[in-house]
Regions:
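Phosphate-ester processing/binding pockets and catalytic centers
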Residues: 1-3, 14-105
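Active-site-flanking beta-strand signature of metal-NTP-handling nucleotidyl enzymes
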Residues: 5-9
Length: 105
């Protein structure tokens, strides 16, 4: 079986980009802008588990590294962190905010 997906990655300044780039190249991934790739991934049973194990075998990751994938499953678009977790967005506070009134009940 196979699926197509977008992968976003943030390995920081000391990350194993060489290992990740070799893995992406081995999977004929296409570059889609800064730290984003598009690829087709072949798997036998459980795509996410196999993908996570495959990347972990080829890329030296630490606890701060993040890899997020976006794929289609059963006519829905899904996204999930394979490694790492969501951080506070850098754009928080730049948009128009409603004025909040503090009052005592």
């Amino acid at each position: 079986m196979h699926t197509v997906m977008w992968m976003s990655y943030d390995l920081g300044v000391k990350g194993d980009y060489e290992g990740l780039y070799a893995w992406l190249d081995d999977h004929d991934a296409k570059e889609c802008g800064n730290s984003v790739a598009f690829l087709r991934y072949e798997y036998s049973a459980d795509c996410l588990s196999e993908l996570k194990e495959d990347i972990a075998r080829h890329v030296n990751l630490d606890k701060r590294d993040r890899i997020y994938i976006i794929w289609r499953e059963a006519q829905k678009i899904r996204g999930q962190f394979l490694f790492g977790k969501r951080k506070a967005a850098p754009w928080v506070g730049f948009g128009a905010q409603e004025v909040q009134v503090d009052e005592e009940d």
